[in-house]
Amino acid sequence: MKKITLLICLMLCGLFVVGGATASAAGKKPMDKEKAVNGLHDSFLFDKEELGELFDSGISYMELKKLCLHAYAAKKPVKEVAQLRDKYVWTRVDYLLGLTPEKLARAEHEYKVDRIHRLFGLDKKLVDKYMRMGYASHQVKRAMFLARHCDKSVEELLALKTRQQKWGDICEQLGLPRDACMK
């Protein structure tokens, strides 16, 4: 009897945990189509209509972003990569596209450097230099923006940024508004 009671209690607890997790996930809004399509177009320069069709087909934003990266790296149309992905797992898709981890990483690096240059007008060679030093593209962008407002070099600003030290805090230490690294 005790075992049955314990088993029922565990099952009920499991239902509450699963139900609660589902409810919180259900409250999460999906990515707005226009925002998703515009963002991916700005990043990868693929056709907005084509991206919209793929988004409408039920592909999640993150999956579509991954499709774009692979298409960019392989220099193939996004729809062609999406058709491969419908049939195969990513490792097989990469093989069929001739993408090695190194080629994919190189293409991702190139796309990020190009994107920052196109969208923010930052020097491509400098962005590339700092990203090759292991800094994330958003850190490089913010340090380059911030360097315009103070007497510190980009290298010095990147050195100030740690996981604990936020960009807004660095701006304040330099006597600048918290958002100085954003423009």
Predicted regions and their residues:
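Positively charged n-region of N-terminal signal peptides that target proteins for export
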Residues: 1-6
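A broad, structure-centric signal for solvent-exposed, well-ordered loop/edge residues
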Residues: 7-8, 71
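Bacterial N-terminal signal peptides
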Residues: 8-17
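Short, intrinsically disordered, low-complexity terminal segments
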Residues: 18-23
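General marker for long, soluble alpha-helical cores
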Residues: 24-183
